[in-house]
Amino acid sequence: MNKKFLVTVSDDYANLTSLEFICSFFKQLSEHQITLLHISRLDAADMNKALMKMWEGPDGGGTGKLTIGARKALDKAVAMLKSSEMAVEQMITKTFAERYGKVKDILNEGSEGLYDAIILGKRASYTLQWFFERSADETAQSIIQDSSLKTPIWICPEPEAGRKNVLVCVDGSRGALRAVDHVGYILSRQDQHTITLFHVENGAGLNTEEMFREAKQILQTHEISEDRIKTETDWGISVAATIAAYAQKYRFAAVAVGLEGSDQSLLKRINLGGITTSLITRTEKFSLWCCP
């Protein structure tokens, strides 16, 4: 089944790490549909200039108006996808002025478009790249605690050559199992990547054998073969630090974590969001997949 991704693009055409990640991660990008999304800031200096024009994408499927910088960024994004052998007709472009704030706008678009993932960039200096123009901690908390978050979010720093495979964090929760399901679905035809189910022991006394068994069953529904699945545990007081250290040591391309759904208490959601926020500040080399 083709995957459908929403990729954010800003005026900063020199930094398109979200595009760089998907171009390096997927073996057959032509199986996927990519929507390039640009949201103009209401106070952007060139919003009122006469040089704004309708985007005429390769497939004629674009909507909205563009600033000069956004046009350059989208042109570069198209060129990157072409070099990755993605058919141009499988690309859609959208652009519009900020409506309810960029966090809410991107979540609304992600929900309405029924995307499999929303893909953002991230600077190694711990700032979410160009898109939100806020600190990583503030943006992560805004996203994670927002009740409209229904679509997995990928936060992607500049990819490092040679990285591969996905580390999926499991703790027995429904949120973690949703992360397992998301990874299995995304990697169902990407057999160049293995999946490692990872649990951080912290004295809670959870049944890891049962936890891994249930996660493996989910992966098998996506036709992930047994030889592509690994299980690992580690001990650590700081869950986020332990996850990040393991991902760095074994050079994973991505780390997937689950978020509790809206039926969980706000306190649980905020606490789990704190772990995710901490991971965001540590994602210098691997992408972070946050699954609601």
Please provide the spans of the model-predicted regions.
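Structural beta-alpha unit
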Residues: 1, 41, 79-118, 123-125, ...
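Gly/Ser-rich helix-loop-strand patches that form or flank binding pockets
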Residues: 4, 27-28, 103-160, 249-292
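Short, well-ordered alpha-helical microsegments
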Residues: 15-16, 103, 176-177, 239-241, ...
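Aromatic/hydrophobic pocket-lining residues that form π-stacking "cages" and hydrophobic walls in ligand
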Residues: 22, 77, 106-107, 183, ...
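Hydrophobic anchor at the start of a short beta-strand
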Residues: 34, 88-94, 153, 195, ...
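A short acidic, glycine-rich active-site loop
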Residues: 56-72
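N-terminal membrane-insertion helices
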Residues: 70-78, 212, 216
